[in-house]
């Protein structure tokens, strides 16, 4: 499968995704790409999955599983820090190691942008990316994101 052929779909998080969430949220290598730097318990994640309304207006966030057309999970994408007054949200994306550099990240950013624009009617998506994360910076630039601010000592 080439980068241009990487077809994915986004779906709601199911209880069966708990192990995946647990692995991602407790992977210390990923703590620098998000706002959390503490482990999450299975109980906390189970509670999140059970109680999330999947309504971005209620929760101010929405998380989706990224999977291939064949149903294989390749990652997770979310819109967080949703600001309905200013029609914007922050994008978070994790593609599992085994699926990186196959176009899944690019396809995911394309689909989440389409969802944000055409379903949620947002006019701005943004992301905080560590300046050392060259792969992610390149991915977002290639999808049309522009670097507008470098935050020092963040």
Q: Where are the model-predicted features located?
A:
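Acyl-donor (CoA/ACP) binding surface of acyl/acetyltransferases
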Residues: 1-18, 27, 68-154
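Generic alpha-helical scaffold signal
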Residues: 15, 39-42, 60
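Generic structural signal for secondary-structure transition and capping sites
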Residues: 18, 29-30, 54-57
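Conserved GNAT-fold acetyl-CoA-binding loop/helix
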Residues: 29-51
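Short, intrinsically disordered/low-complexity patches at protein termini
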Residues: 43-46, 54-57, 97-98, 125
């Amino acid at each position: 499968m080439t980068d241009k052929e990487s077809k994915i779909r986004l779906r709601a998080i199911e209880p069966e995704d708990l192990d995946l969430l647990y692995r991602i949220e407790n992977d210390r290598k990923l703590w620098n790409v998000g706002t959390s730097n503490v482990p999450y318990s299975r109980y906390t994640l189970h509670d999140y999955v059970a109680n999330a309304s999947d309504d971005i207006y209620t929760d101010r966030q929405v998380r989706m599983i990224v999977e291939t057309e064949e149903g294989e999970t390749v990652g997770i994408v979310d819109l967080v820090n949703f600001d309905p007054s200013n029609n914007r949200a922050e994008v978070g994306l994790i593609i599992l190691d085994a699926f990186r550099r196959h176009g899944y990240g690019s396809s995911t950013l394309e689909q989440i942008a389409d969802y944000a624009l055409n379903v949620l009617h947002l006019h701005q998506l943004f992301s905080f990316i560590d300046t050392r994360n060259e792969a992610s910076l390149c991915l977002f630039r290639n999808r049309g994101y522009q670097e507008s601010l470098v935050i020092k000592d963040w």
